[in-house]
Amino acid sequence: MALLGPRTALALSLALAAVLPACAAGPEVQGNPSPDGGGFVTIPDGGAVTSCRGNRDGTIARSEVVFVPGVEVRYRINPPNTLANVAPRGAPNPDGTRTWDFADRTGEAVTLSLSTSAGQWWQSRFPAAQYASRLDPRSPNLGVYRAGDDSVELLGLVAPGESTMTVVPYEPGVPVLRFPLTLGTTWTADSTTRDAQVEGTPVASRDRYTFVVDARGTVRLPELTFTDALRLRIELTQMFAAGPGVRKIQYLWLVECYGEVARMTSRDGEVDPDFTQAVEFRRLGL
């Protein structure tokens, strides 16, 4: 189990670099988009002032995803080793969009932040990396990322400290976001781990990811309502050198300039896209 557990947590937390855009413009925003569908979101605590302009046109362009190291984002999440009751389908609207009501305040308050790769102990293992952030607020391990002109790649996982002996590189990196994102966008990614260790134990896996932007609509949170969110479905199939494989489904709700505002991750072995229990249910909140 030492072989499978940590490695499984890596890929299934995946958290899609959507954590990263959220770190750029979470609850720290000042000002809201205007009623006509446009507007600026200003990010005040990332050093130099950074702005992002969203137009709520149903498409998330690369320019509508910003990365500001040091910005903190707060989420509500179910406690470790619990299952949250969820409804990923939401309610249908007459215009074909959907409404997801995530206004429930239950769960623990957690904080995530984005850091740069400069000066990190693992920098030499990931020379192309730019950023790092925890994959799961309930675990210390970090996802390592590269943000390009048309995608954000997950390059691997590391522990915060070198003494833990956790380094899991992906070959090739997994494009967890591809731009532009709009309803119907889909892509797949295959990746393997080589020369990887989790707490000093060698690990190896072959992973296949399928990404689909499969819905658009309104997300209601305790403090905020987003009227033009995209839902990204990720299906992961993971095969190990020893032991059974793993399959999971994850949903991310993405918004221009805010990034990820909600997430649901199914239990292992889930095949129903309308699953009703999640090992992780995360919502942006104070």
Name these PLM-found stretches.
Residues 26-35, 39-126, 189-286:
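Acidic, serine/threonine-rich low-complexity disordered tracts
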Residues 12, 154, 255-257:
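Short, structured coil/loop segments at alpha-helix boundaries
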Residues 20-22:
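C-terminal motif of bacterial Sec signal peptides marking the signal peptidase cleavage site
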Residues 120-208, 212-213:
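Extracellular-facing segments of soluble proteins and assemblies that are Gly/Ser/Thr-biased and enriched
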Residues 1-14:
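Bacterial N-terminal signal peptides that target proteins for export
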